[in-house]
Amino acid sequence: MSKKVKKYIVVESPAKAKTIKSILGNEYEVFASMGHIIDLPKSKFGVDLEKDFEPEFAVIKGKEKVVEKLKDLAKKGELLIASDMDREGEAIAWHIARVTNTLGRKNRIVFSEITPRVIREAVKNPREIDMKKVRAQLARRILDRIVGYSLSPVLWRNFKSNLSAGRVQSATLKLVCDREREILRFVPKKYHRITVNFDGLTAEIDVKEKKFFDAETLKEIQSIDELVVEEKKVSVKKFAPPEPFKTSTLQQEAYSKLGFSVSKTMMIAQQLYEGVETKDGHIAFITYMRTDSTRVSDYAKEEARNLITEVFGEEYVGSKRERRKSNAKIQDAHEAIRPTNVFMTPEEAGKYLNSDQKKLYELIWKRFLASQMKPSQYEETRFVLRTKDGKYRFKGTVLKKIFDGYEKVWKTERNTGEFPFEEGESVKPVVVKIEEQETKPKPRYTEGSLVKEMERLGIGRPSTYASTIKLLLNRGYIKKIRGYLYPTIVGSVVMDYLEKKYSDVVSVSFTAEMEKDLDEVEQGKKTDKIVLREFYESFSSVFDRNDRIVVDFPTNQKCSCGKEMRLSFGKYGFYLKCECGKTRSVKNDEIAVIDDGKIFLGRKDSESGSPDGRSVEGKGNLSEKRRKGKKGS
């Protein structure tokens, strides 16, 4: 009788290993590599430009024993590599296959959920490493190494600080700086918002654009106490259920509804995907959380329909939805983020999850269930009211719920009521409300809205949204105040340098085009070498490692002598200086934006439009004493 071959599965994390082990039992041993085992070296560039961008890989410090263990497992028996199904995971699998001399074998398994049905199917159908996906990931890694290893030392040398520059992070920083510049330039216009209230309903004056009325007109409008129904149109309006979550929409909704940062959302989602201990063993609660897709498997749809029928009735089950046109930026055919078992209700899950895990799971569970339900239906009444002489008109809309559909699960706020009047009928009394308001600029980004914009523009990927924003915050390039993101002095000065010298690196369109190129490498339409050559030719033509960044900007700050102060950078960091010799230090994280060569410190309140700059009058301090006699240092 032949000896039974031992079987091993390699995953990234212990939690994932434990969940898979609880499914497969003693049939397989499951080992965690703890993420990447090999990468470009930290101590040197690690890319041979003379050999067509050949990478020089090295075992990550502290992972030597992991590599030896993997080699040992490959010698002992059959080794299956089950790292994540995205590009990063494919690259990890490739490195593992290389060090274990198993490249070319069908030893790669992928899955979007860690459930018995899917895991058992995956181990039956191993495939070879997807080298197109690996090349796309290696190209991204080398591109980022070229940019980071070239530009970061320039920033270190000039600012004596652990700063960095990169393709995605710099393009994202540009979005925040550009928005602050828009707010700075915005000139508010006053206008009147005029409404009439009657029978608990509201209608707004009908004008082509927001306008400011003169006093005589306002007095005339204020005297209106009766209107006539000129037009009434009734129709049935359906509201389609939301799609199940993908990475970006989960991050946005968790930020909006739960107040979670995008990093916190991804950390908790990872825990729910990899598994949590329950009475039935280690169980995964959601599918893979880094995805561009809203696709749902037929199996999951059927499970959802069964639950909806059981709990709410067959009339709530959504029809087979027509597959929507796929987004050109979607990286591959992942599934949406959904519960692995829709019958695991949030109440039941709460027995095993901590508070934050339960909140996020409930959000995912409700969104998925709602996505498989019928649209909600309302009776929509659009009406027009006019004064008897026809001089002024007011328009309004009111909704009356007919069928709640998906809103049974996914609550939505709508303006509901009834319009009991008919055309020609008089509406009396009416109360006129006149409010003087100002136009407002676009709001500053929150973490959620920044992710939405990054996705819309094609900057980064689901796996990089959270880490990019976290990096910008950690570097001090941006600052979060009451949930809104502001550029700082250091962020604005670095961005000004990058925009002037490396406009392509920070260009949103260039960064998005580069992501498209990487997609084409993965699809086999382009080679990684061509993408790298094209980028390097452009980048190397402007790169100068000896660049000196001169910080000398006029500011919006006045000295006590009345003259404008300038921003400079010296031995002790950023500071303001005046011709009269007075100086004042400023913190790296003070809010600032550069516009037309001038740096504006403080912030402009987007609600009121009033400046919030801080005066520097009479602020002699320690840094002034340090710099005495060192003007212009």
Swiss-Prot record:
MF terms in GO: DNA binding; DNA topoisomerase type I (single strand cut, ATP-independent) activity; RNA topoisomerase activity; zinc ion binding
Keywords from the UniProt entry: Disulfide bond, DNA-binding, Isomerase, Magnesium, Metal-binding, Topoisomerase, Zinc, Zinc-finger
PROSITE patterns the UniProt entry points to: TOPO_IA_1 (PS00396), TOPO_IA_2 (PS52039), TOPRIM (PS50880)
Entries under SMART domains matching the protein: TOP1Ac (SM00437), TOP1Bc (SM00436), TOPRIM (SM00493)
Active-site residues per Swiss-Prot or TrEMBL entry: Y288
Positions of the Toprim domain: 6-115
Region described as Interaction with DNA: 164-169
Disulfide linkage: C559-C578, C561-C580
GO annotation terms (biological process): DNA topological change
Pfam families the UniProt entry points to: Topoisom_bac, Toprim
Cofactor annotation: Mg(2+)
CDD domains to which the protein is assigned, alphabetical: TOP1Ac, TOPRIM_TopoIA_TopoI
Positions of region (Disordered): 601-633
Renumbered zinc finger spans (C4-type): 559-580
Enzyme Commission number(s) of this protein: 5.6.2.1
Site (Interaction with DNA): H36, R140, R141, D144, Y149, W156, R290, R475
InterPro entries: Topo_IA (IPR000380), Topo_IA_2 (IPR003601), Topo_IA_AS (IPR023406), Topo_IA_cen (IPR013497), Topo_IA_cen_sub1 (IPR013824), Topo_IA_cen_sub2 (IPR013825), Topo_IA_cen_sub3 (IPR013826), Topo_IA_core_domain (IPR023405)
Keyword Zinc annotated: yes
Record: residues binding Mg(2+): E12, D84
Residue span, Topo IA-type catalytic domain: 130-543
Family in the record: Belongs to the type IA topoisomerase family.
Subunit organization: Monomer.
Its job: Releases the supercoiling and torsional tension of DNA, which is introduced during the DNA replication and transcription, by transiently cleaving and rejoining one strand of the DNA duplex. Introduces a single-strand break via transesterification at a target site in duplex DNA. The scissile phosphodiester is attacked by the catalytic tyrosine of the enzyme, resulting in the formation of a DNA-(5'-phosphotyrosyl)-enzyme intermediate and the expulsion of a 3'-OH DNA strand. The free DNA strand then undergoes passage around the unbroken strand, thus removing DNA supercoils.
Name of the featured protein: DNA topoisomerase 1
Organism: Thermotoga maritima (strain ATCC 43589 / DSM 3109 / JCM 10099 / NBRC 100826 / MSB8)
